[in-house]
């Protein structure tokens, strides 16, 4: 195949930014969509590029393209450099490909951000980061650079705070764009990024993926004013002292993306459907979930649920354990690794906390024999755990029936809030946190499922953390509204005693 200068430019763009779709490639190359579609078809016929499918809750199904081994060799030849140099200086090696495939859903959102920025600034570039605190660096005109940081769904407060601390110590960018999964964590991140050295802007991941370039969805670390992406990037200053990442020591030409690779861990983001990814997120949030409860949270029937679970079972992503005659669902170690790598968190820590695997293979199944510390605790108190799951299913079902939207439903490890009261660090540890969007506005609440708080001393101990929390200004600061505390009782007797 003969390559024209425009073809070499398109291949070079895919070498710098693998797994762009056609529309994103058109926006970043400055060529028409029709021309890009035509050239991609020719590249596929010549074996210069390969493609994978990708879809998520925030990104509609699309095909994403990357250079094949033949494409890497051809681009190196056209640019007059050894292909080994191309492998070490651009993210086209097999090692880089696997890393980006593991983060494909996150990469898709960041590419949407870059596509929006290309509408008002050109030329525009993006450099992926392998181990730096930022996910990528957006290269603007006039030597300006903006760091892009995505906070994943499974990232905990401590891990993200460490990333932000490292980011502030990393030179080379004049602004920071932080993408957060929900309003609560956006407000927490806003406190972390406030202050020098670079100005920071934050937005919800859903808004970044679905809103247009002119939508005012970006917020500064202080003040309530919302800015468009153009306005936010207008504050980016030229940066100096950039510290480049150390290149990979061992690189190799990319392997073909054969159908046999679909079971590989790094291919899961391309192999899984949106519904399957949603099911994995819910099982990850609520370990030991009953299949019926999962169906209610997903809003699907029994037949569809059976199909989803069969597929996840086949890929080895979930574990089914029978306890008291009822099946319970949890993420397998492989499923935990999939979520951890998607969100740039530690696989080892995820397994240490949540693994359902037995500590002793010969010991009978029991909560004492579960290796994950938090999974063990939830299984030990399974009656309470299932009660909270049951309440969640009722909430999700009623929200759908009444035309409301369940915006946020956080499990205990994300629902906890930490604050200072009388110079001491305090916390509230609810069973869940929910945010529901109704016709009359947003309603938020902490859930407390009560079975034993029937004695005065016990009741006081349960309510004291909330009284301290609401005595500060943090509830409004953390949520943008005042959440209620919803106490649910198992029977009328417990309710009477509590009240």
Model-derived features: positions:
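A short acidic, leucine-rich amphipathic alpha-helix
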Residues: 22-30, 291-298
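Non-catalytic C-terminal interaction segments of nucleic acid-processing enzymes
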Residues: 2-3, 8-9, 13, 22, ...
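Active-site metal-binding core of divalent-cation-utilizing nuclease and nuclease-like domains
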Residues: 52, 95-162, 375-385, 393, ...
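Accessory beta->alpha helical hairpin/"wing" motif in late/C-terminal subdomains of nucleic-acid enzymes
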Residues: 53-79, 321-360
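Short beta-strand(s) of the beta-wing in winged-helix/HTH DNA-binding folds
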Residues: 21, 47-50, 66, 290, ...
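Short amphipathic alpha-helical interaction segments
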Residues: 2, 30-45, 299-314
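A short, conserved structural fragment
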Residues: 44-55, 313-323
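Leucine-rich, amphipathic alpha-helical/linker segments
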Residues: 83-113, 349-396
């Amino acid at each position: 195949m003969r390559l024209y200068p425009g073809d070499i430019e398109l291949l070079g763009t895919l070498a710098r930014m693998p797994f762009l779709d056609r529309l994103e490639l058109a926006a970043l190359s400055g060529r028409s969509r029709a021309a890009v579609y035509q050239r991609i078809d020719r590249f596929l016929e010549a074996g210069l590029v390969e493609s994978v499918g990708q879809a998520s809750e925030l990104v509609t199904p699309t095909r994403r393209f990357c250079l094949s081994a033949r494409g890497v060799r051809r681009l190196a030849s056209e640019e007059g450099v050894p292909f080994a140099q191309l492998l070490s200086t651009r993210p086209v090696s097999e090692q880089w490909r696997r890393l980006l495939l593991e983060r494909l859903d996150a990469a898709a959102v960041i590419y949407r951000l870059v596509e929006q920025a290309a509408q008002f600034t050109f030329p525009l570039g993006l450099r992926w980061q392998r181990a730096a605190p930022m996910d990528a660096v957006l290269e603007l005109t006039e030597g300006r650079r903006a760091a892009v940081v995505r906070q994943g769904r499974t990232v905990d407060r401590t891990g993200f705070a460490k990333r932000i601390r490292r980011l502030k110590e990393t030179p080379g960018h004049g602004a920071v764009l932080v993408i957060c999964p929900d309003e609560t964590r956006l407000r927490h991140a806003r406190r972390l990024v406030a202050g020098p050295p670079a100005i920071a802007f934050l937005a919800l991941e859903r808004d970044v993926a679905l809103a247009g370039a002119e939508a005012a969805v970006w917020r500064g670390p202080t003040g309530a004013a919302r800015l468009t992406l153009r306005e936010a990037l207008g504050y980016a200053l030229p940066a100096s002292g950039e510290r480049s990442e150390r290149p990979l020591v061992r690189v190799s030409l990319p392997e073909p993306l054969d159908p046999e690779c679909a079971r590989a861990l790094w291919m899961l983001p391309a192999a899984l459907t949106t519904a399957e990814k949603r099911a994995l997120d819910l099982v990850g949030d609520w370990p030991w979930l009953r299949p019926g409860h999962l169906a209610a949270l997903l809003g699907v029937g029994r037949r569809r649920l059976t199909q989803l679970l069969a597929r996840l079972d086949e890929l080895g992503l979930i574990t089914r354990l029978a306890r008291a005659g009822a099946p319970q669902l949890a993420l397998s170690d492989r499923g935990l690794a999939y979520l951890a790598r998607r969100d740039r968190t530690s696989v080892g820590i995820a397994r240490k906390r949540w693994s359902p695997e037995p500590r002793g293979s010969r010991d009978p199944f029991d909560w004492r024999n579960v290796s994950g510390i938090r999974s063990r605790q939830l299984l030990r108190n399974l009656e309470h755990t299932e009660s909270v799951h049951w309440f969640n299913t009722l909430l999700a079902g009623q929200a759908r029936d009444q035309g409301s939207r369940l915006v946020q439903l956080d499990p205990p490890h994300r629902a906890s809030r930490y604050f200072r009261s009388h110079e001491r660090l305090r916390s509230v540890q609810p069973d869940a946190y929910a945010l529901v969007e109704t016709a009359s506005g947003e309603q938020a609440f902490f859930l407390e499922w009560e079975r034993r708080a029937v004695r005065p001393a016990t009741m006081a101990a349960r309510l004291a953390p909330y009284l301290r929390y609401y005595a500060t200004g943090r509830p409004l600061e953390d949520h943008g509204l005042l959440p209620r505390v919803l106490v649910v009782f198992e029977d009328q007797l417990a309710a009477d005693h509590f009240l």
